[in-house]
Amino acid sequence: FLGKSCDTLIYANGNALKYKANEEPLFDFHASVASIAEYIHNIKFKKFIHISTIDVYDNKTSIMKTKEDVNIDTNKLNIYGYHKYCAEEYVKHFCDNYLIFRLSGLVGKGLKKNAIYDFIHKNKKVMLSPETSINYINTRFIAETIFHIQDLGIDNQIFNLASKNTIKISDIENIIGVKTEYTKDAYLYVDNNQINTEKIGKYIKLSSSEEAIIEYFNSLK
């Protein structure tokens, strides 16, 4: 694709493995920051749509702390979140026309890196604490929303792209009717993700985490 041109470039590249970012920060920088520069400077486009993550927020414990315009303390970010934040800043600096979408937890056809997948496969154990709270969104809904926002002619904005609610990992058992086992280390750390969706909710009807999980679960049958 380098050296070519297009009307809209949707960039969903970069490292998606948080543990690898912490183990190999240089690798993560090249994968999530340097790589985006290659595309921005070597492809001619009219609009750049960047797929980012809610991990750019230094505090996700309340919806007031995950508003798109909140001041982010980069010193509190882990390596993964900091590099994703740097990538966003690069887009904002070099792209005259952009959209940035910060995604929550992903489920969708073909995806295997999530707790629901681990729930239904007996050879796997869930690595997240049952008390961890996550906002799940289906990849199908993500694509539909991005194209809808683009069609509205909205430019140079950041959106949290997430479902309207957060659930606990322990709730998944009741949602899909499947019990699971947890790894020993799963209980050591409890995460709490409360994502503000007020801004994007003005333009779309938000789905729920339960709907996202059920659709994904049915696709795996």
Regions found by a protein language model. Name each.
Residues 1-45, 54-59:
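NAD(P)H-binding glycine-rich loop region in Rossmannoid oxidoreductase-like domains
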Residues 9, 142-146, 161, 172, ...:
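Non-catalytic, hydrophobic alpha-helical segments
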Residues 16, 54-58, 69-70, 104-107, ...:
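Active-site segment of SDR-like NAD(P)-dependent oxidoreductases
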Residues 27-35, 61-101:
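Catalytic helix-loop patch of NAD(P)-dependent Rossmann-fold dehydrogenases
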Residues 50-65, 79, 106-110:
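Conserved catalytic-site region of short-chain dehydrogenase/reductase
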Residues 89-135, 139-141, 148:
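NAD(P)-dependent short-chain dehydrogenase/reductase
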Residues 145-195:
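Mid/C-terminal beta-alpha module of Rossmann-like enzyme folds, strongest
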Residues 179-221:
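C-terminal amphipathic/interface module of NAD(P)-dependent oxidoreductases
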